[in-house]
Amino acid sequence: MKVKVGINGYGTIGKRVAYAVTRQDDMKLIGVTKTKPDFEAYRAKELGIPVYAAGEEFLPRFENAGFEVAGTLSDLLEKVDVIVDATPGGMGAKNKAVYEKAGVKAIFQGGEKASTAEVSFVAQANYEKALGKDYVRVVSCNTTGLIRTLSAVQEYIDYVYAVMIRRAADPNDIKHGPINAIKPSVTVPSHHGPDVQTVIPINIETSAFVVPTTIMHVHSIMVELKKPLEAKDVIDIFENTTRVLLFEKEKGFESTAQLIEFARDLHREWNNLYEIAVWKESISVRGNRLFYIQAVHQESDVVPENIDAIRAMFEMADKWESIRKTNQSLGILK
């Protein structure tokens, strides 16, 4: 029996999760919602994906464009077992009451507060805590990136300080910036540290800057160690950590541009780089401090987490079976 999945919000994250669902042998994509008949809605229809209006109030937009929808969100909820809410930050919390009324499980994204769901989720760190849950929150792209690597060395961590160098906007976003400035988050810690703590219990402080780029985030991470660890040990740990890849400057990976080109060379859909990219040369231990630099593809690293969250909520597989199935279906390298 396949779990029937709906996607509320077919944008940057929603369309990637929708694609990922179609790659699973234990899930079925029932439909997606849009607020307007834009190119993404037309493309979904071309792909044979039923498109629903996100609400009754949006129906005139589709009618005026001659775009036939399969119904509204309410209709979609009658047909699914779980809805993946990929709406803009803050909307998910408002939508929760609708999902509760429909008796449908829901997955929220990192733009929502942790209190929106029963558990905040990163598969490799706390898969078991989502087993059988009705409401799960996949943490943000940045938080997912931090947890992927920090959970791998968690037993060594005394304290973490991470600087988040955030992209200003997604590639298709014309509304956000800056385009000629560096914008600091003047409140310390930034929200990322407390968000990490909703998944793994570590001491962490973060600060953040927004810079004029669209393709990836970069994190500069310093870990104070509570027991000895050498750089070669960290390399071994990361090499054996799922959804983390090591890249070398000597092989031409000098910036985020080459990392995205690597994803393109893999012929990944939307040049997705699901894995967290760690620069191997940046891994260094000085005294009791570990340093490393990593990059996060903000459009895609949370996608496999959404798939694993579905399996956990329906208790369809154990942690490593789910991760293996998801990785294999999406071409994740390890």
Curated annotation (Swiss-Prot):
Subcellular location, record wording: Cytoplasm
Record Pfam families: DapB_N (PF01113), Gp_dh_C (PF02800)
Keywords for the protein's UniProt record, in alphabetical order: Cytoplasm, Glycolysis, NAD, NADP, Oxidoreductase
Residues noted as binding D-glyceraldehyde 3-phosphate in the record, renumbered to the chain: S140, C141, N142, H192, G193
UniProt: NAD(+) binding residues: T12, I13, G111, R167, Q298
GO biological process annotation, one example: lysine biosynthetic process via diaminopimelate
Record organism: Thermococcus onnurineus (strain NA1)
Quaternary structure note: Homotetramer.
Pathway linked to the protein: Carbohydrate degradation; glycolysis; pyruvate from D-glyceraldehyde 3-phosphate: step 1/5
SUPFAM superfamilies in the cross-refs: Glyceraldehyde-3-phosphate dehydrogenase-like, C-terminal domain (SSF55347), NAD(P)-binding Rossmann-fold domains (SSF51735)
Positions annotated as active site in the UniProt record: C141 (nucleophile)
Family assignment from sequence similarity: Belongs to the glyceraldehyde-3-phosphate dehydrogenase family.
Gene Ontology MF terms in the entry: 4-hydroxy-tetrahydrodipicolinate reductase; glyceraldehyde-3-phosphate dehydrogenase (NAD+) (phosphorylating) activity; glyceraldehyde-3-phosphate dehydrogenase (NADP+) (phosphorylating) activity; NAD binding; NADP binding
Gene: gap
Enzyme Commission number: 1.2.1.59
Gene Ontology, cellular component aspect: cytoplasm
Reaction catalysis annotation: D-glyceraldehyde 3-phosphate + phosphate + NADP(+) = (2R)-3-phospho-glyceroyl phosphate + NADPH + H(+); D-glyceraldehyde 3-phosphate + phosphate + NAD(+) = (2R)-3-phospho-glyceroyl phosphate + NADH + H(+)
UniProt-recorded name of the protein: Glyceraldehyde-3-phosphate dehydrogenase
Family matches, as PROSITE patterns: GAPDH
